[in-house]
Amino acid sequence: MTSKKTILLVDDDIDLLENTSYMVKSMGHDVITAQDGLEAVLKYKDIRPNLTIMDIKMPKMDGFDAFFKMKQFDPDAKIILITAFSMDEKKHLKAKSMSLITTIHKPYSFEQLEEMVNKYA
């Protein structure tokens, strides 16, 4: 059994956020949630999670801009971006150059999520 970690989940889709939160909690980890990039950055600074899993397309601040702010605050931040859409290739390349772990596409399975959390948290 892996040790309990704190995971920050960020998505503006409430149903997906609740389902993903349930899945991560079922793995034995603590979950903190945010519904937009701005809230995510503030919570990241406050809790310093072991891993952040964040949607790209969100209101107030998108996932890329939140990623850049988190990395500016903590260059060692572990962040996975998720998307259901095509992405801004320039921002994606910049994020990869700043140690973006990976980008996964919606819908993702419990197994994919579990693998990512176990590997990177």
Regions found by a protein language model. Name each.
Residues 58:
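Receiver (REC) domain active-site loop signature in two-component systems and cognate sites
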Residues 47-53:
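Active-site beta3 strand of CheY-like receiver
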Residues 65, 86-104, 111-115:
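Alpha4 helix (beta4-alpha4-beta5 surface) of REC/receiver domains from two-component response regulators
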Residues 1-6, 111-121:
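Non-catalytic signal-transmission and effector/linker regions of two-component phosphorelay proteins
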Residues 14-32, 98, 120:
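Two-component/phosphorelay signaling modules centered on CheY-like receiver
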Residues 12, 54-55:
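Active-site T/S-Asp motif of two-component receiver
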Residues 35-39, 62-66:
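Acidic catalytic/metal-coordinating carboxylates
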Residues 82-83:
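Hydrophobic/aromatic residues positioned on beta-strands within the core alpha/beta folds
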